[in-house]
Amino acid sequence: MNEKEDIMDNKRVLIIYTGGTIGMKATQQGYRPAPDFLDSELKSIPDLMREDFPEWELYEMYPLLDSSNMTLKEWNEIARVIYENYDRYCGFVVLHGTDTMAYTASALSFILRGLNKPVVLTGSQIPLSEIRSDGRDNLITSILIASEGVANEVCLYFSGRLLRGNRAMKMSADGLVAFKSPNYPLLAEVGIEIRYNRDAILKRGEDVKLEYLPFHEVPIGVLKVFPGIQFGLFEEIMTEKLSGIVLETFGAGNIPGGGGELLPIIKKAFSSGSVITVCSQCPMGTVTLGAYETSSSLKGAGAVSGKDMTTEAAVAKLYHLFSLELSKEEIKKMMEKNIAGELT
């Protein structure tokens, strides 16, 4: 192998296609993912076929999914493909539907412990097969980022912005700037050049070994409080059905009614082995249990603060910790500690 071939081999990227808008085909019934269709679309993009562009290979999952149908099974499968091919590629691009992309990014950040290569999730709001697709730049730039080995963590790239995967949130259903990271700075901004914010990127030692820690099926639920909520309607599911609960509260962790109806439910859920994590409905800011009287009672009842975690990250983290078969007390403790850059 000559020097040029060696360099190109080191720049090889694996593209994992899970489904989603970016590779969908127009049919009489509307857009749908179609097996083998994306491969021909990619080969028709001149920039992807240039000699000076990183070498790439396509891995197509089966079945291809609309991302609203993504489950733990698919999260584990995506991570398994990365784990089993880790030494063969310098980075990975995961093509994914936008609806649950932030959930998958969060999940991968926990399943792939010790990751020291870029894993970049991206997609599009307009299919590649359409004339005015945002997918071309998203894909091309994601491959470049994956090949450069700077942002060695699970990232999400969309419309000129590289975000930490477990800090990202989908902010627009139809806008091209669909994702933001309200509580964490950008990992990179893309204009004429890719400008990395190296201080914001996770730092890991060169000798870190990648581990594959798949999620197990665990009953997890999300409950969003609202004015007038009748907590009693949710008592059975909170106390008997769920192991982990993400409670989306007002502001910094406040609940309606002073917690009079909710607190006995939380105490009962806690005594039955559930872990209740409090996140804010606000995209920006942090949960501080005890900052207000209405949140102090939550802490006293056994709930833990999700701090500035997104709901997506909190859900994935609960799956992760329960899958490690930790005790309830260990899980409570770890929910408030940073594991993969998910909280400040």
Language model features: what each stretch is:
Residues N2-E84:
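ATP/NTP phosphate-donor binding region
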Residues D9-N10, I16-G20, L38-R50, R164-L247, ...:
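Accessory alpha-helical/coil subdomains and C-terminal extensions
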Residues I16-T18, V94-H96, V120-G123, C155-S159, ...:
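Short beta-strand segments
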Residues A26-Q29, A105-S106, I131-D134, R164-K170, ...:
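Short acidic, glycine/serine/threonine-rich loops at helix termini
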Residues L95-K117, G257-I265:
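Short Gly/Thr/Asp-enriched flexible loops that form oxyanion-binding sites at enzyme active sites
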Residues A105-D134, I143-G149, A269-S280:
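Short, acidic/small-residue loops that bind anionic groups at enzyme active sites
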Residues L121-G191:
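Internal gly/pro-rich beta-alpha loop/helix module
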Residues A252-T344:
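C-terminal non-catalytic interaction/assembly regions of soluble proteins
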